[in-house]
A protein has these predicted regions:
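Acidic/negatively charged segments and metal-coordination signatures
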Residues: 1-200
Length: 200
């Protein structure tokens, strides 16, 4: 198994999950690569400068994004993820997450973006910047109460009679956004999994 495949898989998984234990990383890489990695062989295969170049680190047997190092936020994320399965897309889809800003273009996110382009007032740069911000905000620290201020901060406006529909589109997009605290699953997927489990 080539080290490049290990690095590609690992970088993509850390971007998708936010944090992942060394042991779980081995299990998932093995499932994609038909390999037999264990923590010992994984350590010897990794070039840590590759991870650091992607703002990723190994702390206490966990690979994580640098943003979760502040104030030990990774501990909160690990707790939030407890007992959840890992979302494992196709290998082709997984590797899209090598790009740190990649986000799956769901129909709900596409509808939200189209609505913003149609109804928001502001310069092209302001609207594009807000689209980028909102896409990241949906998966990181989404709070519906922050939406009005965020619009103003980016120099944009929206007609008052369109605001309620915009908020609903935000909520829909968030429900279908892959989240770190869900180990890559969307809230919608977890809800459906819970319902199916209750029926069985």
């Amino acid at each position: 198994m080539k080290n490049k495949a290990i690095h590609d898989d690992l970088v993509a998984m850390i971007n998708l999950y936010g944090v992942i234990s060394v042991e779980d990383a081995c299990t998932i890489i093995n499932s994609y690569e038909k390999a037999d990695l264990n923590p010992g062989t994984l350590y010897t295969s990794i070039q840590f400068e590759v991870l650091e170049a992607n703002q990723m680190f190994l702390v206490n047997e966990y690979f994580m994004l640098e943003i979760f190092l502040d104030e030990f936020e990774y501990l909160d994320l690990i707790e939030a993820q407890e007992d959840l399965p890992y979302y494992q897309p196709s290998k082709k889809e997984l590797l899209k997450y090598k790009e740190d800003l990649y986000q799956e273009e769901t129909p709900e996110l596409k509808a939200l973006k189209e609505y913003i382009i149609k109804w928001f007032k502001g310069s092209k740069v302001e609207i594009v910047n807000y689209l980028d911000y909102l896409s990241y905000f949906l998966k990181d620290s989404f709070n519906i109460e922050d939406i009005p201020n965020s619009i103003n901060e980016f120099g944009c406006t929206i007609p008052q009679n369109k605001f309620e529909e915009f908020i609903q589109l935000c909520l829909n997009a968030h429900m279908h956004t892959r989240l770190w605290q869900n180990r890559g699953y969307t809230n919608q997927e977890l809800s459906e999994m819970k319902q199916n489990k209750q029926r069985s």
